[in-house]
Amino acid sequence: MNLGGNRFVQIGNGMSNIMYTDANGAVRWEQISPPAGFPQQQRGRGRGHVAFGLPNTLDWLPGFVQATPNSITISNMGGIQISSAGVITAAINSEQNSWMLSSFNPSLKLTRQVTLTDFCDPTAERPGLPIIRLRHHLDAIGSSPSSTPPGRNPQELDEAWAALSELSVSGRSDTTGLRPSLLSLTFLVASRSGEYSDKAAAEAVRAHVLANYRDRRTEQRLDRFGEYLQAMVRTHVFPHKHMTVFGGLISHVIQDKLASLTAVAGGVQEGARTNNSAVPRSSVYVPACAFLDVDHELKLGDASAKFVYLIFVYSQRLRREGVRVYVAVSKFDEVAFEDAVSFLFHKARTESAIRGTEGADAPEPHPNAALPLQELSSSRCEPRCPPSRLNNREFTNALYQWAPDLRGRPNRTSCMYAAYIRLGAIASDPPRTTRRSERFGSVDMPVVWLENVRWDPQDWVECSY
């Protein structure tokens, strides 16, 4: 470092700032010399004087700055500000103020997974397509006996998967450990294309999968995968419980029927480079039949930043179960979005509440199945328990023991009509969404492009009547 003709170098301000606040919220700053330090605790009680100060910048100099008669060596140049010629001031503490250096640099999180191409062929898709990760099928089959309502056969789920696995690349009795662990959004939509209101766009998605997945058994695989989804709803092993968000596709490496997919799991989709030199950047796109602008449907306007959601909509009519999936944008957060879903899918909500218990073979209700609240309250012989003793078994054991039989009665799972998860957000205001027809091989498919999508998947939220 060349200091020129300067004889004095100042590192650190030699002072500490202290902020005082009074009961009225007024703020004043004071500076004290380094030996005095700064208070660590609140002065007084309530909203009294609160002291807060940044540590002296000289505190972190040992190990970072080495001074000799001929030179000054700075080990870590991160956050060093040269305020004037020959005068170096350590302006930013590397530990406490690192956010000032990184807050404007968007982070990116990539994920990679190896999968069979049964349900996701990356060569037929473009970068930006949402990809879904599937849990192991034994997890769903193992939970079906306990979740299936009485009167329904939990083995139907096992049989549906067995029929689907017969068309798998690895076969039904696979011992290699490889499985189709990833599911493309287009394959999922194509498997239930008959349930969408936009019939033409949905049929275009199915035609795209049949034409570009390059497997003569693709049509059978679509039909059996749709039947597998129906069996999951019938046994109350809902699909969303065994699916998570993988991210937005950006690149892939494929050999035969085995592919390694890389996707954006966190951060802006456009921030990652693809392996296509012609299109180095990608935006998120979804099939037009599976896109839903919630604010537009509710006539709330479009001028605001929006969240991006993935929605599963269920219909629990016995033997005619329905599964639809949508990618929706809305300015509502996770809590308020549930009311919007309830309003938009009121038909599915009502039908699931009415028909969710169809086929239940439950025993006849016992005459004393209802809680005899009036009789208990009017009888002086029945024991009582004060609220302060509810955790004491000596008092609660003497109370009337009521164990209702809920078999065959509506419950939370029998009335479930939807589930959604927040995928991320569109930071631009207003958000840029464009619908146009794209060419996939020999098929034209209408899609909706979403720009500046920042991936940040959250947890599933279930909707019941």
Swiss-Prot record:
One of its GO terms (biological process) is viral capsid assembly. InterPro entries: Herpes_1. Interacts with TRX2, MCP and capsid vertex component 2/CVC2. Structural component of the T=16 icosahedral capsid. The capsid is composed of pentamers and hexamers of major capsid protein/MCP, which are linked together by heterotrimers called triplexes. These triplexes are formed by a single molecule of triplex protein 1/TRX1 and two copies of triplex protein 2/TRX2. Additionally, TRX1 is required for efficient transport of TRX2 to the nucleus, which is the site of capsid assembly. It comes from the Viruses. GO terms for cellular component: host cell nucleus; viral capsid. One of its GO terms (molecular function) is DNA binding. Its main location: virion. The keyword Cell cycle does not apply. Belongs to the herpesviridae TRX1 protein family. Keywords: Capsid protein, Host nucleus, Virion. The lineage of its organism: Viruses, Duplodnaviria, Heunggongvirae, Peploviricota, Herviviricetes. This is Triplex capsid protein 1. It is found in: Virion; Host nucleus. It comes from Equine herpesvirus 1 (strain V592). Transmembrane segments: none annotated.
